[in-house]
């Protein structure tokens, strides 16, 4: 075991790194991949007392001698080297330094990626000019928005900026909440599913109910980088508080199953996209102030969702490859641009992302600032929508 495994502490919890598969596992016997590893490679069955003794020694070693490591599920921005790391299947990752996209072995740098369930595609990296067309440009954006000044072009730039921000999970500790509002048959769910398919190779919208409060943090944790909350039309009181915690870079402390005293700090890095016809849940000022509103109109011509998603999956190597190329352009801007702290906007990190996105598209900074002002006006309008006192006045 010592020859093929390396023991770490990740957020205070014992983990082992498999040198052969380049994968990180928590050393809990209730964790199925860890049990499979012990049984298949070393003949240690989880019911054998010897196995429990071995895992106890592993956990003891990690507490006294284990090296601390950052463990992530999808992406990691390293502030010291100013490089972006992205998971790429079993044992591999991408390192983006602003010039080149390097494929490297998982665990060789400052981050170790946990196993993920995404489908792996070998990307065709380059400026193909297909990403925006496949995911952003063909949506039917509403021309009559709440504020009246958020144009279709603004919404396209806003949506693309959010898609690119999904690659910088820990770089944006306070994450914007994408709120996609539209009537039936406006394509709001499909719009988010296409993004999820392009980045992860699968689609998994979630429906949140009144009894899902305990599971919500874990659901977000596993749906990195994008969690789709679908058709959230009925206000749920606990969801307001959970969303407020999420948008302010908070987290949740949860007790480890089958223990009385062990706990884990859950801080999801997923970007949440919510589809709704009634955004009443998100009109609370501390939530609305961190929302990105995309308003879609009814589509007169409907296509087959299955065929549309299949087309995205077919093009995924080029779409994902262009996404990586655009992320690398942003990394270069991050490394060479002095970031100002005097933005007149909330969510300064995301505001900077909008400016970088505009630049790599060849737009002037004024286009980004116009969008950011319009987006703030739209958030202000969201708080006041359907306010009976305002109607009375």
Regions found by a protein language model. Give the residues of each.
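N-terminal nucleic-acid engagement/recognition segments and initiation subdomains in replication
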Residues: 1-126, 154, 219, 325, ...
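Catalytic micro-motifs at enzyme active sites that drive phosphoryl/nucleotidyl and oxygen chemistry
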Residues: 4, 70-76, 81-84, 163, ...
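A structural signal for short, well-ordered beta-strand segments and their strand-loop junctions
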Residues: 85-87, 179, 293
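A short acidic (Asp/Glu
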Residues: 96-97, 188-191, 237-240, 285
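P-loop NTPase catalytic core of nucleic-acid-dependent motor ATPases
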Residues: 100-223, 354
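Well-ordered alpha-helical segments embedded in enzymatic catalytic cores
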Residues: 158-162, 242, 322
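Feature primarily recognizes SF3-like P-loop helicase cores of small DNA viruses
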Residues: 173-176, 202-241, 255-274, 279-393
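AAA+ P-loop NTPase catalytic core and its hallmark functional loops
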Residues: 241, 245-253
């Amino acid at each position: 075991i010592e020859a093929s495994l390396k023991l770490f502490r990740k957020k205070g919890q014992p983990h082992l790194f498999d040198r052969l598969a380049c994968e990180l596992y928590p050393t809990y016997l209730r964790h199925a991949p860890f049990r499979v590893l012990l049984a298949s490679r070393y003949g240690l069955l989880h019911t054998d007392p010897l196995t429990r003794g071995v895992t106890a020694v592993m956990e003891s070693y990690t507490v006294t001698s284990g090296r601390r490591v950052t463990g992530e599920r999808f992406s990691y921005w390293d502030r010291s080297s100013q490089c972006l790391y992205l998971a790429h299947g079993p044992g591999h990752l991408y390192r983006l330094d602003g010039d080149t996209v390097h494929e490297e072995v998982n665990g060789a740098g400052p981050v170790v990626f946990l196993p993920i369930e995404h489908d792996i595609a070998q990307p065709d990296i380059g400026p193909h000019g297909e990403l925006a067309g496949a995911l952003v440009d063909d949506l039917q954006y509403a021309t009559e928005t709440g504020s009246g000044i958020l144009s279709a072009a603004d919404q396209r730039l806003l949506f693309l900026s959010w898609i690119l921000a999904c690659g910088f999970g820990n770089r944006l500790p306070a994450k914007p909440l994408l709120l996609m509002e539209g009537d039936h048959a406006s394509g709001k769910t499909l719009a988010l599913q296409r993004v999820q398919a392009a980045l992860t190779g699968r689609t998994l919208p979630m429906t949140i109910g009144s009894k899902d409060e305990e599971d919500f943090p874990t659901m977000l944790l596993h749906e990195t980088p994008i969690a789709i909350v679908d058709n959230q039309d009925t206000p749920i009181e606990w969801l307001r508080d959970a969303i407020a915690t999420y948008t302010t870079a908070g987290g949740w402390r949860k007790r480890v199953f089958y223990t009385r005293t062990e706990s884990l700090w859950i801080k999801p890095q997923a970007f949440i996209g919510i589809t709704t016809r009634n955004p009443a849940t998100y009109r609370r000022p501390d939530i609305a102030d961190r929302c990105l509103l995309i308003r879609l109109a009814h589509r007169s011509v409907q296509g087959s969702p299955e065929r549309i998603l299949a087309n995205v999956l077919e093009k995924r190597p080029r779409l994902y490859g262009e996404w990586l190329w655009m992320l690398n352009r942003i990394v270069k801007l991050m490394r060479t641009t002095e970031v100002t702290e005097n933005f007149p906007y909330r969510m300064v990190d995301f505001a900077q992302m909008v400016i970088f996105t505009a630049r790599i598209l060849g737009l002037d900074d004024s286009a980004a600032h116009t969008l950011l002002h319009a987006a703030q006006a739209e958030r202000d309008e969201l708080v006041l929508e359907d306010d009976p006192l305002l109607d009375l006045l």
